[in-house]
């Protein structure tokens, strides 16, 4: 799930893994597809706040090493290498 963060330009990415994942990471065009660890919350969800300029960004979550699209965001794109990615529209 993506939503506006508390500060201007911040985007909140959140995921509650279906199988209670132990490690969740976020990777996308905004961090050169280098996975960054998301913070686990008391409710079992994982959250990451990213500062982004207006634009369109492709991204995925990595749950215990498995790359997945955002199950709460139906916006998708086919990448240049033939994989399906989630899409975040900012601004």
Feature-to-residue mapping (PLM):
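Aromatic-rich carbohydrate-binding modules that target alpha-glucans
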Residues: 4-54, 66-91
């Amino acid at each position: 799930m993506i939503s506006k963060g508390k500060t201007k330009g911040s985007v909140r990415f959140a995921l509650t893994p279906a199988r209670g994942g132990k490690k969740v990471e976020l990777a996308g065009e905004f961090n050169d597809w280098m996975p960054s660890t998301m913070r686990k919350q008391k409710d079992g969800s994982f959250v990451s706040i990213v500062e982004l300029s207006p634009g369109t960004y492709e991204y995925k979550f990595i749950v215990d090493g498995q790359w997945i699209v955002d199950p709460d965001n139906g916006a998708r794109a086919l990448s240049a290498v033939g994989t399906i990615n989630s899409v975040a529209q900012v601004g």
